[in-house]
């Protein structure tokens, strides 16, 4: 995959993630300077999960995010379209399901909450993915999307772009089994909607009352919304 865009081939993306599963968690921690752990905790806190609730963790990868969500006492299932990623996390004691974000293998109104972290960019048609997530969520259920976004401080934003396009690929070549995956990451982040535009897309595709919270100066934005209904 020579150049990333928001028009991506699902097979290419799945194959790319299959190749990075073994070192994925370590690579993310190194490249984010440890912030990935903070972002996972903040996602759990934002969802305000209750014991016994059913939660879908979509694009869960190795399920490290699912384990964090399960600390709430909720029943959480990890779903990802990369079998290699799920296999790399098979030692984690959480339910796992292989599934495509555009055709989820779950019945209507199955979950109290759905979350997707750093995976919405990778769904072939992310708008259809948002609608599919709404389909499997109960009326009144919650959505949280954690995604790389647009830094809110201009000077910091300039430094961040330099890091994405210059330093990140170099570090990835040292710590990742497939550095091309992180070149894709950098390019797809640059093509992604900013916070306001993504909130508009979420509200237009099955959800309502979308707002967001910036993390680490807007490197990550956490969008939250509700499925309309009782």
UniProtKB/Swiss-Prot annotation:
Pathway: Quinol/quinone metabolism; menaquinone biosynthesis; menaquinol from 1,4-dihydroxy-2-naphthoate: step 2/2. GO terms for molecular function: demethylmenaquinone methyltransferase activity. S-adenosyl-L-methionine binds at residues 62, 80, 100-101, 117. It is an enzyme of class 2 (transferase). It catalyses: a 2-demethylmenaquinol + S-adenosyl-L-methionine = a menaquinol + S-adenosyl-L-homocysteine + H(+). Transmembrane segments: none annotated. Its EC number is 2.1.1.163. One of its GO terms (biological process) is methylation. Keywords: Menaquinone biosynthesis, Methyltransferase, S-adenosyl-L-methionine, Transferase. The keyword Methyltransferase applies. Methyltransferase required for the conversion of demethylmenaquinol (DMKH2) to menaquinol (MKH2). Belongs to the class I-like SAM-binding methyltransferase superfamily. MenG/UbiE family. NCBIfam families: MenG_MenH_UbiE (TIGR01934), PRK00216.1-2 (NF001241). This is Demethylmenaquinone methyltransferase. It comes from Corynebacterium efficiens (strain DSM 44549 / YS-314 / AJ 12310 / JCM 11189 / NBRC 100395). The lineage of its organism: Bacteria, Bacillati, Actinomycetota, Actinomycetes, Mycobacteriales.
